[in-house]
Amino acid sequence: MGASPPHAPRGAVTLSLCFLIALLEGFDIQAIGVAAPLLIPALGLTPGQAGVVFGAGMAGLVCGALAGGWLADRMGRKPLLMMAVGVFGLFTLATVVAGGPVSLGLYRLLAGAGLGAAMPTLVAVALEIAPPDRRTRTTTLMFSGMPAGGALAALFAAGFLARFGWHSIFLAGGVLPLLLLPVMARLMPDSRAPAAGGAQRPGAVEALFGQGRLLITVLAWFTFGLTLLVLYLLLNWLPSLVAAKGLGGVGGAGAAFAFNVGSVIGCWVIGMLVDRLGPRLPIIAAYPALALSLFGLAGADSLLPVLVLAGLAGFFLLGAQYSLYGVIPLYYPARSRGLAVGASIAAGRLGSIGGPLIAGHLLGQGWGPAGVAMAMVPVVLSAGVAAAVMTIRGHHAGD
């Protein structure tokens, strides 16, 4: 029986569930950053140890993205998503009992593996349910749940951490995904089945690098690596960097909230522009605008400019990144998109491991918040050059 587009109610239910999964992922990813001003002194972590703990979560994301993208193309989207949500919920909950850098790093590594496995699967589901002329908007709408979840984590931190301690945010972030599992089991339809056993499926090397895709794949990995280096540096360290400017923990949580709200708006706006204008102009323009935002953030010392510039940084950074999630898979055949997205995200996660480690090292060397922000400007501009070449040279592979 031929595949047909899912009818509107089924697609809406699937997209809503994917949005909720992305929201819970965003909450979990941001939780460690907004909890850091309390967690680091409570566990007696040095800046270097904190960077290693943050990096462990990113390492889990790398492994999860590679495994999740490969498995999603073979075992089906729904079983993989349920497994991933269960893993990141369970080990986020386990973070509550962490007593030092080793146990904390282990739990963040395993939670990151679950988070990483979910991400390429969400992209594949969004591409399946979206009309061809709304693919980028559908993908960015779904992924706007991640910064929305990050904003909720920042609000949670501002309202509850001082009263209930750093454990409370991981308790909430672990229980909620586990509660979502029975809802997914009942309401989420099975996605596109894996190819029949007799169908010829290309090997990983052929799928990623064959038929003239070598340049696109390398550029995609490079762009994702540098962009996610900056993203996860900010997600993990922005609250602490702002607090170090003399604006306190509340100022740090406010900056994280502004960053995530700007990210949600950027996902919607830049995703819409990509569908209307094509990917080149919106994505190419976003990177220099992001560099200017970080340059301004480095010099800002009062709360209002910090909030505005953090919001602008989120707008351009996440707007460009999540639009690329919707654009890059289209450069590959449909049967290989889960693998392609997973490989690109995994390459990005290698960069994301470096972001927290670099920030911890620079702070330990006395660079201060302004120096860390300024160090990210050339990284952003390099990613922008790679994204420009990729969107100019890339071609739609068809379904």
Task: Cite the ranges covered by each PLM segment.
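Extracytoplasmic gate region of multi-pass secondary transporters
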Residues: 32-33, 212-268
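Helix-breaking motifs and short loop linkers at transmembrane-helix boundaries and internal kinks
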Residues: 44, 76, 97-103, 131, ...
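Conserved MFS/SLC helix-loop-helix module at the cytosolic interface between two early adjacent transmembrane helices
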Residues: 63-101
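Paired small-residue
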Residues: 87, 91, 102-111, 304-312
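Cytoplasmic helix-loop-helix junction between adjacent transmembrane helices
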Residues: 107-144
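Helix-loop-helix hairpin linking two adjacent transmembrane segments in secondary transporters
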Residues: 142-186
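C-terminal membrane-cytosol helix-exit motif in multi-pass small-molecule transporters
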Residues: 175-194, 383-391
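C-terminal transmembrane helical hairpin of 12-TM major facilitator-type secondary transporters
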Residues: 274-327
